[in-house]
Amino acid sequence: MGKIKPDEIRSIIKQQIQQYQQEVASVTIGTVFQVGDGIAHIYGLDDVMAGELLEFQDNTIGIALNLETKSVGVVLMGDGTTIQEGSFVRATGKIAQIPVGAAFLGRVVNPLALPIDGKGEIKSDINRIIESPAPGIICRRSIHEPLQTGILAIDSMIPIGRGQRELIIGDRQTGKTAICIDTIINQKGKNIVCVYVAIGQKASSIAQVVNILQERGALEYTIIVAATADSPATLQYLAPYAGATLAEFFMYNGQHTLIIYDDLTKQAQAYREISLLLRRPPGREAYPGDVFYLHSRLLERAAKLNEKLGGGSMTALPVVETQEGDISAYIPTNVISITDGQIFLSADLFNANVRPAINVGVSVSRVGSAAQPKAMKQVAGKLKLELAQFAELEAFSQFASDLDQSTQKQLARGQRLRELLKQVQHSPLNLENQVSAIFAGTHGYLDVISIEHIPIFLVGLWQHLVNHKPKYGEILNSTNTFSEEAQAILIESLKYLTEEFLPPVK
């Protein structure tokens, strides 16, 4: 091996010096001077931005929420038990974002989009910011497509359109989650991606939802975002935004999505906890002043996009829990004013075995009727009015001793219509079955059937139409209208069944 001459060594060193590029990265460092209850106060982070992610020495991530004169208030995404006073904190220069994509379908993730179902890692190269801005006015178009829930009372009287925000409100244990799960099950085969966000719920309750969706074959098109009751308040606060971010990926790719926030009361409570620990001034019911903005910026992300942006949609079903039916409390009134209508569930109706326990008089959809299928509009137009008149008559009849024939007839029909709207959990109805049931009730074909036999009669009617009159279903599915031909087929079937299926009431 030849010796290297000193001149060659010198030229190599010079060459290396010329090629050397010095990379200097400046990192903003702060010091923890107080930590506890999921909150850390940092000194020295002068250039930090609102909402910026911060990294602690133990790799815990936090979000800068309070920017004060001499310190920064940070909410932690972990328990923070290993963070010590005096430890260093690094500003990342990023704001919260999560991976998104089709790989998340059928999975259960936490609000940071990390899998918690034991099925392995989720691989995705696409990231979206958690706090994405809502689509502007020009980006939207009016709601015109129906979103069928499969629940007769909702689809007929409180219809929901794709891109709408419909609040589900009621006391605890009145069937709010059941309506949401039934709606997800009913989207099977309709090319709709569903996102179910569970906020502050028991892990056992979330596991039950996962099992139901799996049994019904609905998990394959559903993403579940879970922030359990033992999760830090920060994750419970972020969970709905993470769910909206996952749904937005599909919406901006021209697909239809349905997102359920179960429930926003617990998110508001988590945000109240964070705000009080950060020493923000409390307002009504000790909530901070920006609790309205907390929900408005979330629910405004639901939209029906115009054709230029692909025509996708995000339909939001936020859930709010009331105390003793008090819808005039702070969070219920806030969310009612943001949404496009509400479905009110009554504890009294639930206890009276009217399930789903929807109070039709108080419930309203401000948009959905524009998106209701024509067939449903044709048969359900007078249903809400008839039920309202029946409720008034029923209250009056409790005080009256003798009622005339027409009043008795109206009461009998009202009782049958109420029975008609009862539905077994996890058994959503398709459009042709809904239309046939409402037509039978409003046109007096159930008047001769005893109330306890109505569910059996309806099942018999639906089976008869499928087995002997398939043309009826074909007309409704192909045209979405209740044509004269379909009406004639249905009347013929109803006449046959009222004579043959059950004996008339004596």
Curated annotation (Swiss-Prot):
Reaction(s) catalysed by this chain's protein: ATP + H2O + 4 H(+)(in) = ADP + phosphate + 5 H(+)(out)
Residues of the site described as Required for activity: S363
Pfam families, alphabetized: ATP-synt_ab, ATP-synt_ab_C, ATP-synt_ab_N
Annotated binding of ATP, by residue: G170, D171, R172, Q173, T174, G175, K176, T177
GO terms assigned for molecular function: ADP binding; ATP binding; proton-transporting ATP synthase activity, rotational mechanism
Subunit and interaction comment: F-type ATPases have 2 components, CF(1) - the catalytic core - and CF(0) - the membrane proton channel. CF(1) has five subunits: alpha(3), beta(3), gamma(1), delta(1), epsilon(1). CF(0) has four main subunits: a, b, b' and c.
Protein name in the entry: ATP synthase subunit alpha, plastid
Lineage summary: Eukaryota, Viridiplantae, Chlorophyta, core chlorophytes, Trebouxiophyceae
